[in-house]
């Protein structure tokens, strides 16, 4: 069996490359009993039809609830000597959360919209129910993750502190599909941090969540990690921070270990557009948070923005470099020269808006690549602009 977790639509071509390199038939219909079962999961599985022909089945939701059931079914059928791909997929489709595309029939209206979506057998569920793990603290977590022989992007200990989000950004699929917000107990997180650092030898630990600042026991956890990481010379990474919720005290404590850049995600340059997407950030929030960061000794800031959001205008786009320049000016105006930790480095990273299912913007129009690049060029005058180039994925 091969499990592929797909988080972004731009990674679809990687799926085909993986199958091709493994010499597995690309289409599910072309695979035989000796080929592995290709299981899809992750956020993209909530809208599986664009890639349904390449997968044998999809796991809709969070894997902790039904993975054992699914894998035990596969092992038992293999051990019995009665295994066949068709029989296994039929039985797997009865497991809550498992979607087998080949066992459903779609009828369309004349205008191309769906008229009906029905299972081809009576014992197959008509509706797939997403799986939600309501006990993150008690769930199995990889305490000894595999350490690759080569340098990987996620070359660090990843510690999931919570799942879900208390915010409601209208473009964010994760904030919708991972509801309700659930936290992992701080005692369990301390145990995991110690075990994972000892078993991997990584020099960085990252706290994973959609909004790390909103974790209720963040200060206690950070204080513990500082003590642990200081002994091992390990860096602490705090992604997914909201400027309006970021604690200066926590920031200064983390800074004492090892310097790294702070990452903020205003998503839109103008206040008007931030209100449209329900981001909940004002210019004052952003500048106050940046000021506190600079006073705390930081001089590197990454800003993430999204282009192509609904109702976006040229004025909204030009507000992106303007906001970055305002933050940079704040650094030099408020931090005395003798206290500066080098030059202020602000990096703007832009991605393009992709309408996601199960979000308020799911029916919004998506830009084509040329439109996106044209909008990105508006901010090109800013030295450290990074924009995704769609051609590289093809």
Predicted segments, located by residue:
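Acidic, low-complexity intrinsically disordered segments
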Residues: 1, 5-170, 174, 180-181, ...
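Short secondary-structure boundary/capping segments
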Residues: 19-22, 53-58, 74-76, 176, ...
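Conserved SAM/AdoMet-binding glycine-rich loop
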Residues: 10, 194-347
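Conserved small/polar residues in nucleotide/adenosyl-binding loops
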Residues: 1-6, 383-390
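Hydrophobic alpha-helical scaffolding
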Residues: 57-60, 125-129, 147-151, 155-163, ...
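Flexible loop/turn segments at secondary-structure boundaries
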Residues: 9-12, 45-48, 66-68, 106-108, ...
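Aromatic/hydrophobic pocket-lining residues that form the small-molecule binding cavity
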Residues: 15, 67, 189, 218, ...
